């Protein structure tokens, strides 16, 4: 391990990998460190991503695609299922990835581009000089090394500590952390081409339950509920076990994954002098769906591009790096996060009866395409009273 790099990236998930690949392709010296002993494991993700979203960063490869989705379903609290055909999304729905293989592919590409990669390497503290970040102390194979860098990109996930160490408030309120559990199950009867979402306060309070196929008779079956709704006897696992017992009584669980997902607004600021936060560390997960793969790759790539420009200009100050923060907030992704946060806040306050009404109403709409924005617009046309309930959000998208 060298003692000096242009860019030091902490975290080997999709955000860190795209940052490393992009920076290396631009000719910068790059060090990517991952605290776990293997890239891509353990998987803490439902593994879904849209086709067009994926293609923006990497061509699809059967090696790391578990299943191709051609539709989706949303199940209301009363059991009514609304079906969404692929034609509503222009025939471009999405994939269920094999994240263990996918994440490694991204990091391999970063390494091929010239990035140095170290696993089982933890950033234990920042190196500060005159109040400015200069790098990090890395614990690697039983010893500590000081590595300096012109800029550090923190891609250290939902548990991100590095930003906090550098003075950025990364605290997430308990109510905005989803407590999540997922089983990888086999020998279950499913529609192998459709992702299914279950809503309702009896099924998943202030959250949802999902079935994401990974083959003809295999799927990720998981749940995310609000942290404030979790407690003894009503943990996320308790709700999931009840669902599995009813829906897949003869299914076999071959893996159990637990974790937390932030469904809050993004951090107030995602940069400091010589520092940028990306992906889950920046809290850019979609607050409505909990999805974060695309947002992670987008912010990782953008951060590296801005870093390269700022290094070339010799200015890594917070003011110079703010172009990254401004650009992702102004992007389609950033606007979607803000809109979906308001939708999420609206939906979690609704009783099951209201959720039933909304889903039944949507099922009757003549949707030519399906997206969150289209859905809300059509709902407002069909239910003008929602204008008052949705308030500023409704006004902003009319």
Curated annotation (Swiss-Prot):
GO terms for molecular function: flavin adenine dinucleotide binding; geranylgeranyl reductase activity; oxidoreductase activity, acting on the CH-CH group of donors, iron-sulfur protein as acceptor; oxidoreductase activity, acting on the CH-CH group of donors, NAD or NADP as acceptor. One of its GO terms (cellular component) is membrane. Pathway: Membrane lipid metabolism; glycerophospholipid metabolism. Keywords: FAD, Flavoprotein, Lipid biosynthesis, Lipid metabolism, Oxidoreductase, Phospholipid biosynthesis, Phospholipid metabolism. Reduction reaction proceeds via syn addition of hydrogen for double bonds. Its EC number is 1.3.7.11. InterPro entries: DGGGPL_reductase, FAD/NAD-bd_sf, Geranylgeranyl_Rdtase_fam, Geranylgeranyl_reductase, GGR_cat. Its cofactor is FAD. Is involved in the reduction of 2,3-digeranylgeranylglycerophospholipids (unsaturated archaeols) into 2,3-diphytanylglycerophospholipids (saturated archaeols) in the biosynthesis of archaeal membrane lipids. Catalyzes the formation of archaetidic acid (2,3-di-O-phytanyl-sn-glyceryl phosphate) from 2,3-di-O-geranylgeranylglyceryl phosphate (DGGGP) via the hydrogenation of each double bond of the isoprenoid chains. Belongs to the geranylgeranyl reductase family. DGGGPL reductase subfamily. Disulfide bonds: none annotated. It catalyses: a 2,3-bis-O-phytanyl-sn-glycerol 1-phospholipid + 8 oxidized 2[4Fe-4S]-[ferredoxin] = a 2,3-bis-O-(geranylgeranyl)-sn-glycerol 1-phospholipid + 8 reduced 2[4Fe-4S]-[ferredoxin] + 16 H(+); 2,3-bis-O-(phytanyl)-sn-glycerol 1-phosphate + 8 oxidized 2[4Fe-4S]-[ferredoxin] = 2,3-bis-O-(geranylgeranyl)-sn-glycerol 1-phosphate + 8 reduced 2[4Fe-4S]-[ferredoxin] + 16 H(+); a 2,3-bis-O-phytanyl-sn-glycerol 1-phospholipid + 8 A = a 2,3-bis-O-(geranylgeranyl)-sn-glycerol 1-phospholipid + 8 AH2; CDP-2,3-bis-O-(geranylgeranyl)-sn-glycerol + 8 AH2 = CDP-2,3-bis-O-(phytanyl)-sn-glycerol + 8 A. One of its GO terms (biological process) is membrane lipid biosynthetic process. HAMAP family: DGGGPL_reductase (MF_01287). Binds 1 FAD per subunit. It comes from Methanoregula boonei (strain DSM 21154 / JCM 14090 / 6A8). FAD binds at residues 15, 34, 45-46, 48, 99, 123, 280, 292-293. This is Digeranylgeranylglycerophospholipid reductase. Pfam families: FAD_oxidored, GGR_cat. NCBIfam families: GG-red-SF (TIGR02032). It is an enzyme of class 1 (oxidoreductase).
